[in-house]
Amino acid sequence: GATTSRLHTAVKIAPAYHAPVVHVKDASRSVPVLNQLLSPNTRRKFLDELETGYRQLRESYSTSRKNNLYISLAEARANKLKTDWDHVQIIPPARPGIHVFRDFPLEEIEPFISWMFFFIVWQIRGKFPELLDDPVHGKEARKLYADALTLLDRIKMEKLLRANAVVGLYPANSVGDDIEVYRDESRSEILAVFRNLRNQEQKKPGVPNLCLADFIAPRSSLQIDYIGAFAVTAGIGADQLAEEFRQKNDDYSAIMVKTLADRLAEAFTELIHAKVRRELWGYASNENLSLDDLLMERYIGIRPAHGYPACPDHSEKQTLFTLLEAEKNARITLTENFSMVPAASVSGLIFAHPFSQYFFVDKIGRDQVEDYALRKNVNPETIEKWLASNLNYR
């Protein structure tokens, strides 16, 4: 899943278990792996290649750890992204506040589906639609595509999956590495505070140590800035439909349901983000991009998701969900470990800063762990548990 990685499996998990441990990016990829493990003809070769790959990852990781140099949190903050906020055009949202989309038509979401990523889930790589004519994988790809479209048509006709979303657009300012979200432009009432982490790698001259707070005007600048938050799902009904197929011993269709729900959720997120840029916020009202342009992220701004490299702490989803009232407005909930239910859901923040970019927080030092724990009002051990794969001292 998204919270795991092949590197973490190779370095931390596999050495601690007596039997083979295989990392897959999501559940739908388990079937091809299991087929190779269960077949006497492929099992040994698969496991040998797996262990070779893991060994290479461990060696590469060990070398990089020795070569990587880290700086103190104070030094990293001194090397933050420098923005002349007096010369940045900050555009207030055209329609601030909460926007709720319930039972959004799947027909409008479908054009935003990335079929290339659909095929990657089934371990078929290539550019779509050229992939359908590939001499090696074309036949299999065409069957998968036809099956997916047939099921998607049934889902749309019988309304078997439902898509909901909630978006919030608010005044905001950064205070240090945190982002304060306000009820209105008086900034007298704080609705939420997002705690962020800063990259601590030693950089080349002129390269900043980034933090998401760098993309929001500091309160000390006297500028009122803005931030967006969103939670999107296209998975309401997916578990029930998949279970119906499983009861009929049709695991293929059960996996297809989950795969389509995931693709629809990502497509819905793309649609909602475009709607925010062009209409609700309107900071890119003249934007006219193709689907390929959207998937290549050729738009202004970013939408980082908690649990991913720029903001690896999943627990910050709780702040996001409380701010958006995501359970009431979109029927999305969080588990005790901050996974989203339905699984085919996406959430995160929206930044409009013209130079905002995705980046890796990567490894952080004990000084940042202690600072972050203080800001979140938890003990450092809790942070070490949540961010175990992000520590540079273990």
Describe the role of every protein-language-model region:
Residues 2-5, 23-25:
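Conserved phosphate-binding/catalytic loops in two-lobed NTP-binding clefts
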Residues 3-17:
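Glycine-rich, charge-decorated loop segments at or immediately adjacent to ligand/cofactor-binding or catalytic sites
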Residues 7, 11, 28-32, 262, ...:
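Residues on a specific face of well-ordered alpha-helices
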Residues 13-28:
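Structural recognition of alpha->loop->beta junctions
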Residues 14, 35, 39-43, 124-127, ...:
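Non-catalytic alpha-helical coupling and interface elements of nucleotide-dependent molecular machines
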Residues 25-255, 259, 278-280, 289:
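Active-site loops and adjacent core secondary-structure elements that bind or stabilize anionic groups
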Residues 209-215, 220-394:
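C-terminal accessory domains/tails appended to large, multi-domain proteins
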